[in-house]
Structures are given as structure tokens and as C-alpha cells.
């Protein structure tokens, strides 16, 4: 069960690239200050502006930097079911503890479409949804 302070961490950029050094400093500082977990690659973390490679690298990096001291919630949602499945599988393979799957916000499926979207993600990777 998740409890406590679990911030949605920002993704620092420098000269148009993800600034992994600044991200590591920020995450280490937040861990030192007592966070209970972290959410990476959510919309606060610039998920829609990251390339697929950056997204996947950032999840891997957050798991590594956290040193398994706190749970890592990886943003894995997408308007595309196929992409959300890919991100979710990668997050768990990388060691993330939870996947954060937002509802498709651009194409806005009806209730059946939403259930199908989430069900296909869960079937592909038995998730611990958050």
C-alpha cells in the first residue's frame, strides 16, 4: 500500500536534452528529505514532450538512482493503447513498482473504449495500477 508524500517529479532539461545529472540531484535530495515514493514521467514530468527513448531512459534512471529505497511509480499512459502497453512493460522490466496509466486525454474514448484500453494494458502486463 502506498502512503505518505509521493511527489510527481519534474524532468529537468538543458539545451533541449534531458538533464540526467540535475534529475539525479533532485531525486536524491527528495529522498534525503523523506519522500515516501516518486512518480516519474507523469505529465508534471513532461511525459508528452519526451521521446520514447528519453521516457524509457528516465524510468530506468529513476529506478537506479532511487536505489530501491522508495517505490517508483512510472507514468506509462498514452492516447495509444499500443504505446501504453509498451511503456508499461518497459517500466516493470526496468524495476518500477507501479505504472501510472492516465486515461486517453486527446481521443476521449467512450466507457467501453476506456475499459478496453485499460484491460488490454493490464492483460499485457499484470499491473499494480495506481
Predicted feature residues:
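Single conserved hydrophobic/aromatic residue that forms the stacking wall/gate
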Residues: 122-130
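Active-site mouth loops of central-metabolism enzymes
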Residues: 7-22, 72-82, 103-111
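N-terminal small/glycine-rich loop or linker at the start of catalytic domains
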Residues: 1-16, 43-45, 58-71
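Alpha/beta enzyme core
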Residues: 24-38, 85-98, 119-120
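An N-terminal, well-structured beta->alpha segment
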Residues: 18-21, 25, 51-53
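Structural preference for beta-strand elements that scaffold enzyme active sites
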Residues: 4-6, 37, 71-73, 97-100
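Glycine-rich, proline-tolerant flexible connector loops at the mouths of alpha/beta enzymes
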Residues: 35-61, 76-81, 101-114
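Structural motif corresponding to the early beta-alpha repeats
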Residues: 59-85, 90
